[in-house]
Amino acid sequence: VVRITTVEDVTVIATESLSKRFPRVTALDRLSVDIGPGVTGLVGANGAGKSTLIKILLGLSPATEGRAEVLGLDVATKGAAIRERVGYMPEHDCLPPDVSATEFVVHMARMSGLPPAAARERTADTLRHVGLYEERYRPIGGYSTGMKQRVKLAQALVHDPQLVFLDEPTNGLDPVGRDEMLGLIRRIHTDFGISVLVTSHLLGELERTCDHVVVIDGGKLLRSSSTTDFTQTTTTLAIEVTDSDAHPDGTRAVREALHARGVDTHGEAGGLPGAGHILLLTATGEETYDLVRDVVADLGLGLVRMEQRRHHISEVFTSSDDQRKEAVGHGG
């Protein structure tokens, strides 16, 4: 069992050898993981088993085998109690078009057991928090995709849950809308102390937003670690330089100068506008930085960027693919 816990060793979600099999596919395969408080990302490609796991954790779909607990409650026998304490933002559009956000969220609050006055008060507060207060009386059918996502988020929060499941909350949003939604997700925990399990296939979003990340592929656990562990710095140094009249290809000039000093490099396309390509090399210490600085200065070029590369969550999938290919090779 891989653990993600706080210093207090509090577990919000726990699964042990959890499996879910359908006639032609295994959606979850002996998944064992513990998740602590905070914002946790659940990442995997479409079909990896993310939505299936959420449905099991909500007590909406039985597991084939294994067990799971949410907030200390067994999902097999305490589904209703779990749903009282947990909010859920589904992936797909499921909102009634002819009612206002206020009417819908009040209804969902009442369904959660809040009395009428408290439901209206909580709805107003929640819609203000998600940025829909000015538009709260308009029919949902006239909302943009981003506004509809905020309504779904509001109904997940209105009953003041201890934990929320957000299934692909940035789907259909433009870059600005995604950034705003990610900010809201982060504040759910920092401002209100609500733990979050958020699914996404956009790995960069999770790196920026989450405290911890759980990676699953084909229903199996690939890795479960803090985001800091996933994104540790590497020994690879990325440098980018400008061109000049004397050196129309500044990147090539730097590469040749470094090679002359016994430093191997390789290139990577995609530099900033007006700058050359990026060179990658292995940093062996401070002397590498000094050498690059001196080479660029001697050539009379501008240094646009010199930074250590970080690992990314996507490397977990690359490593998994490599291991599968190696296993197939050995099997042949």
Name every feature range the model reports, one short phrase each.
Residues 2-5, 284-332:
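C-terminal coupling/interaction segments
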Residues 45-49:
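Walker A (P-loop) phosphate-binding loop of ABC-type ATPase nucleotide-binding domains
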Residues 106, 110, 117-135:
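Conserved ABC ATPase "signature" region
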Residues 160:
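Conserved catalytic motifs of ABC-family nucleotide-binding domains
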Residues 164-168:
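Catalytic Walker B motif of ABC-type/P-loop ATPase nucleotide-binding domains
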Residues 181-281:
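ABC transporter nucleotide-binding domain
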